[in-house]
Design a protein with these regions (language model features):
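Short, charged helix-capping/linker segments at alpha-helix termini
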Residues: 3-7, 21-29, 40-58, 161
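Helix-turn-helix DNA-binding module
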Residues: 130, 134-138, 146-163
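Acidic, proline/glycine-rich intrinsically disordered inter-domain spacer in sigma factors
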Residues: 3-4, 99, 105-130
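DNA-recognition helix of helix-turn-helix
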Residues: 85, 89, 136, 157-181
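Sigma70-family region 2
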Residues: 21-22, 46-49, 58-75, 94-97
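Arg/Lys-rich amphipathic alpha helix in sigma70-family domain 2
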Residues: 68-72, 82-103, 117-118
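Amphipathic, Lys/Arg- and hydrophobic-enriched alpha-helical face
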Residues: 32-50, 66, 129, 174
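Structural recognition of an alpha-helix C-terminal capping motif at a helix-to-coil junction
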Residues: 54-61, 74-86
């Protein structure tokens, strides 16, 4: 699927990537403007809203630093998306959340309050995702939103494939409960 920046003339985006890799800040700014909304949306779904802005900036700092490593084997947006997912995963691991949220202890997930905070507040899909426990949210976003397979998620997060499947099942149940107002 082509992203907005790649629907331009291919040479324009390729040119910006090449120029930015050579240190051209204006070209990097164009790349940033083309891709920031999608990357921020991804970080918002995988992390808390409060962390999304900071992590999005971290992703683009890392992009600037690693742009010289982009070989063009895939679309720039694919490379950037993968870099973003890696930064988010690294961020979560650095806070030692990984062990707690990926434990096989279902009691940790059962402690989630699934009802809306206020009955009169309209619950939408994004807020339902935010209500998921961090591990379930991450797997839900990677699988159902971003389209990764369980085996790919297992490798990315260093978990068992079965853990990914259980977390996704639990996330879907919690989403249903949250969206139905139960």
């Amino acid at each position: 699927m082509a992203l907005s920046g790649e629907t331009q003339a291919g040479s324009g985006l390729d040119s910006d990537v090449a120029l930015a890799a050579g240190g051209d800040q204006s070209a990097f700014e164009r790349l940033y403007r083309t891709h920031v909304a999608r990357i921020h949306s991804l970080t918002r779904r995988m992390l808390s809203t409060q962390e999304a802005d900071e992590v999005t900036q971290d992703i683009f700092v890392r992009t600037w630093q690693k742009l010289g490593q982009f070989r063009g084997d895939s679309a720039f947006s694919t490379w950037l998306h993968r870099l973003a997912v890696n930064v988010v995963i690294e961020r979560r691991r650095s806070f030692a959340i990984q062990r707690e949220r990926m434990s096989d202890d279902p009691a940790a997930l059962d402690s989630l309050t699934v009802g809306p905070a206020r009955a009169d507040l309209k619950v939408d899909f994004e807020s339902a995702i935010e209500q998921l426990p961090p591990g379930a949210r991450e797997i839900f976003v990677l699988h159902d939103v971003e389209g990764y397979k369980h085996r790919e998620i297992a490798v990315m997060l260093d978990i068992a494939t079965g853990t990914s499947k259980r977390q996704l099942h639990r996330a879907r149940m919690l989403m249903r409960q949250h969206l139905s107002g139960e």
